[in-house]
């Protein structure tokens, strides 16, 4: 017997047996030690063979461990003396005899068990016989498992039953009802069957965008095969999906991955076309396992694919097909592309109706049909970087999951009552310590109040528990119906007509009646008095879309409607003297939120014109604060930074091959992250004329393609462009309003191309600030300063004399409101900062800022 011709698993078992003997203090390595290690190997051959005989490997392991416990033990250091016992040597010799009979090159773990059952003489063989293990049955299952192969190298474990180890049986999953139903997609499934039925190159590859349902088509094919709804050519075929991860995992040595793949391919080949292999993300095979001098997985597939020995279905995205498969012309010609297009909104609704039952069953809730329609339409409109039906299914799933969590959590009403009880109990404990009459009276009142609250809480809790149990019962009945439907389908496949009739016209009818009565019982409870909601509506879907994208698509609450109607008035408190501009901006936002605006264009695109300091940028800030409750919630792009033609790359991202390609553009990335936003392009006349070309598709169709070829959606943005063109005309008092408009229009046409101007919704002229509004602007600026002082613990008020002074001294018709801002900062701000730094004030102190004798002074 050659001990150098052992498989790696047997080598490992003998090494572990020696370590085990040393640890237990046994003087020798016995057959029990070896068998214990052989039976303990989780991915070994011996446990697999015992399982295939419908016996429990655990029972055999326990018997072996019991026998080990009876072994003699010695004290002291045994490591130097541990050798093989007679029984172990006999076992290895018996195993070697079996190896020779089976014409194997290497001694393996299955030979050990076969040797024991054939020539073993010890008590362990008797125990194993009692457990039902017989030599001839074991030999038969071993030969079946090998499929006519012999052990020619030291790692046979990875090559036996490769399909069971490295692939999943989709037919089995379909029989168990674990695959989701596939609705529609009949054309693609038919095309896949056509390609599979060819004599050679019968390998379809499903190509489509991520999330359009490529894997679902294969699952649909598995369902059709199981139901027998396929042509004769692929009837009774078994569909396996390759698990590349488990094939690569644990392949430590060079060539081990190739061995496993070869074994799997040989198994598929030897099935004589009975097995169809599905490889999801097939591009991962290109380059998989390739090291110096080794073939990659795709090259190992090529000969079998070309000869038609391997029926394979691949699935990959358009981008990856182009990047990996098309590069390799030899691999590409062996596959027949089947293009899977994105379904339309109507088709998506049909798909969702088919899946609805599965999601209702999983979450234990009901999904209204209006929610399915909303999921398809809203996801199509607002989630532009993903594809149907995946994004619509995700919306349904998340809305259902949110509702399930709400059912399982304590309702708000109950939670409030519980918190009230806790606070009353704390107060009661405090009052018990008081001795005065008032406290004792309060304690009596509190006890009554607490008793009422607890009673109310118990009533609410009983209602909640009842509603929960009713919803839970509904889920239970639905699960029962699903179970019996699967049993019915299985019985129908086996041809058990009586069983089918018993389930279809007996059990299922009873369960359906039970479901209807449970639904009626739940509906009887008035919706007003219900604590729990178990229906997913379109409003729930809209809320999820809003959470994902930040776009307010849910129905407007009364408060929001009132706020939008008052939008113009709110903006007027922030921007003074530009009422016409504020009205036009407010109307655009109101149209959008009411759903009247064109859905394929931005909410509003405005060109603000006017001299410096009249409130163009301030209007944009006020609008951002109104819409998003945050002044900084706008993307501001200063166009003076884009004076060169090449600087457009900074907006949309550098093209491939240039530095910064992976970083994306400043504009496109900002909008991708926040689709509902305000974008301010400040001082656009400073930019290079070439830069304006990218505005054309943004302003017209509400989209822009970035440097990576991705479409960025601008349909939910407000776009404001500001410019100083014609500011000298608008700031002049020489012209009438009509003349100003005409002159500004001429200058605009001179500076911008007609196609750019034609795409802007409104050109809004901001007029110079007059002395009549400067007082109001001064009030706003001083209020800002007062708020800053308040944060530092100083309560400031301003006298009318001071307001008159800053209004007069800060007014400049040419420069607008900015000189006023600078004056307030310089004179009033400096006076306050000196007062604070002197340390003269105490926290919360009231001070007045006044203008006296030509100076700004702080008066306590």
UniProtKB/Swiss-Prot annotation:
Annotated stretches, region: NBD1: 161-342
Gene3D superfamilies (UniProt xref): 1.10.8.60, Clp, N-terminal domain, P-loop containing nucleotide triphosphate hydrolases
Localization of this protein: Cytoplasm
Region called C-terminal, residue ranges: 769-860
Start and end residues of each stretch annotated as Linker: 343-550
Region feature (NBD2): 560-768
Segments for region (Repeat 1): 6-71
Molecular-function GO terms, alphabetical: ATP binding; ATP hydrolysis activity
UniProt entry keywords in alphabetical sequence: ATP-binding, Chaperone, Coiled coil, Cytoplasm, Nucleotide-binding, Repeat, Stress response
Binding site for ATP 1: 208-215
Location of region: Repeat 2: 84-148
Domain of life where this protein originates: Bacteria
Stretches assigned to the Clp R domain: 3-148
Job description of the protein: Part of a stress-induced multi-chaperone system, it is involved in the recovery of the cell from heat-induced damage, in cooperation with DnaK, DnaJ and GrpE. Acts before DnaK, in the processing of protein aggregates. Protein binding stimulates the ATPase activity; ATP hydrolysis unfolds the denatured protein aggregates, which probably helps expose new hydrophobic binding sites on the surface of ClpB-bound aggregates, contributing to the solubilization and refolding of denatured protein aggregates by DnaK.
Subunit structure and binding partners: Homohexamer. The oligomerization is ATP-dependent.
Family: Belongs to the ClpA/ClpB family.
Domain note: The Clp repeat (R) domain probably functions as a substrate-discriminating domain, recruiting aggregated proteins to the ClpB hexamer and/or stabilizing bound proteins. The NBD2 domain is responsible for oligomerization, whereas the NBD1 domain stabilizes the hexamer probably in an ATP-dependent manner. The movement of the coiled-coil domain is essential for ClpB ability to rescue proteins from an aggregated state, probably by pulling apart large aggregated proteins, which are bound between the coiled-coils motifs of adjacent ClpB subunits in the functional hexamer.
Protein name from the UniProt record: Chaperone protein ClpB
């Amino acid at each position: 017997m050659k001990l150098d011709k052992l498989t790696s698993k047997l080598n490992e078992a003998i090494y572990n047996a020696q370590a085990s003997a040393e640890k237990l203090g046994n003087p020798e390595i016995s057959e029990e030690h070896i068998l214990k290690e052989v039976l303990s190997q989780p991915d070994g051959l011996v446990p697999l063979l015992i399982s295939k005989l419908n016996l429990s490997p655990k029972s055999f392991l326990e018997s072996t461990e019991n026998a080990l416990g009876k072994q003699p033990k010695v004290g002291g250091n045994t490591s130097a003396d541990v050798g093989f016992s007679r029984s172990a040597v006999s076992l290895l010799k018996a195993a070697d005899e079996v190896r020779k009979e089976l014409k194997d090159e290497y001694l393996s773990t299955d030979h050990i068990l076969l040797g024991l059952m054939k020539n073993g003489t010890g008590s362990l063989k008797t125990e194993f016989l009692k457990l039902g293990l017989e030599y001839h049955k074991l030999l038969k299952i071993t030969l079946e498992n090998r499929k006519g192969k012999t052990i020619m190298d030291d790692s046979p474990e990875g090559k036996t039953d490769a399909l069971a180890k490295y692939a999943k049986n989709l037919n089995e999953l379909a029989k168990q009802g674990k695959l989701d139903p596939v609705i529609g997609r009949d054309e693609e499934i038919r095309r896949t069957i056509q390609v599979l039925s060819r004599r050679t190159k019968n390998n379809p590859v499903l190509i489509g965008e991520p999330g359009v349902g490529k894997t679902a088509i294969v699952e649909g094919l598995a369902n059709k095969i199981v139901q027998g709804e396929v042509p004769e050519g692929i009837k009774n075929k078994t569909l396996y999906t390759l698990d590349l991860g488990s094939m690569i995992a644990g392949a430590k040595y060079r060539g081990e991955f190739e061995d496993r793949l070869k074994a799997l391919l040989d198994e598929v080949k030897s099935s004589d076309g009975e097995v169809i292999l599905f490889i999801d993300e097939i591009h991962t095979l290109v380059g998989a396992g390739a090291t110096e001098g080794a073939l990659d997985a795709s090259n190992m597939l090529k000969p079998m694919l070309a000869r038609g020995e391997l029926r394979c279905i691949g699935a990959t995205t358009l981008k990856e097909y182009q990047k990996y498969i098309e590069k390799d012309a030899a691999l590409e010609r062996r596959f027949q592309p089947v293009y899977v297009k994105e379904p339309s909104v109507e088709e998506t609704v049909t798909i969702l109706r088919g899946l609805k039952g599965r999601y209702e069953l999983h979450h234990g809730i009901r999904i209204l049909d209006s929610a399915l329609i909303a999921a398809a339409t809203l996801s199509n409109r607002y989630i532009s970087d993903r594809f149907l039906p995946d994004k619509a299914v995700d919306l349904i799933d998340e809305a259902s999951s949110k509702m399930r969590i709400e059912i399982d959590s304590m309702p708000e009403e109950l939670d409030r009552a519980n918190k009230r009880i806790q606070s009353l109990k704390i107060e009661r404990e405090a009052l018990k310590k008081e001795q005065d009459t008032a406290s004792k009276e309060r304690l009596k009142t509190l006890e009554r109040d607490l008793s009422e609250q607890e009673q109310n809480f118990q009533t609410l809790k009983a209602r909640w528990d009842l509603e929960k149990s009713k919803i839970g019962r509904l889920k239970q009945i639905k699960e029962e119906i699903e179970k019996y439907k699967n049993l019915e389908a299985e019985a129908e496949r086996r041809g058990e007509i009586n069983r089918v009739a018993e389930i279809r016209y007996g059990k299922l009818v009873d369960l359906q009646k039970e479901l209807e009565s449970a639904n009626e019982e739940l509906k009887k409870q008035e919706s007003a008095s219900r604590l729990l909601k178990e229906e997913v509506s379109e409003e729930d879907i809209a809320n999820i879309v809003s959470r994902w994208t930040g776009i307010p698509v849910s129905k407007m609450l009364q408060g929001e409607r009132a706020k939008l109607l008052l939008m113009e008035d709110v903006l007027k408190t922030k921007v003074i003297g530009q009422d016409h501009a504020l009205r036009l901006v407010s109307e655009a936002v109101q149209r959008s939120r009411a759903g009247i605006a064109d859905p394929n264009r931005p909410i509003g695109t405005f060109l603000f014109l006017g001299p410096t300091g009249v409130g163009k940028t301030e209007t944009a800030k006020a609008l951002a604060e109104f819409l998003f409750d945050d002044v900084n919630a706008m993307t501001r792009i200063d166009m003076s930074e884009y004076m060169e033609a090449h600087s457009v790359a900074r907006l949309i991202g550098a093209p491939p091959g240039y530095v910064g390609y992976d970083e994306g553009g400043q504009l496109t990335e900002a909008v991708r992250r926040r689709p509902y936003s305000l974008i301010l392009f400040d001082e656009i006349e400073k930019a290079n004329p070439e830069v304006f070309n990218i505005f054309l598709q943004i302003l017209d169709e509400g989209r822009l393609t970035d440097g990576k070829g991705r479409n960025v959606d601008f349909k939910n943005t407000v776009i404001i462009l500001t410019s100083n063109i014609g500011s000298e005309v608008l700031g002049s008092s020489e012209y009438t309003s009509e003349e100003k408009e005409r002159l500004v229009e001429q200058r605009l046409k001179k500076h911008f191309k007609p196609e750019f101007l034609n795409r802007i919704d409104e050109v809004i002229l901001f007029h110079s600030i007059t002395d009549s509004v400067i007082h109001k602007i001064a009030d706003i600026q001083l209020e800002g300063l007062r708020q800053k002082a308040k944060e530092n613990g100083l309560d400031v008020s301003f006298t009318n004399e001071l307001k008159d002074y800053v209004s007069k001294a800060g007014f400049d018709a040419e420069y607008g409101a900015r000189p006023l801002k600078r004056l307030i900062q310089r004179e009033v701000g400096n006076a306050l900062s000196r007062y604070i730094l002197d340390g003269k004030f105490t926290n919360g102190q009231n001070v007045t800022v006044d203008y006296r004798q030509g100076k700004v002074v702080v008066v306590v």
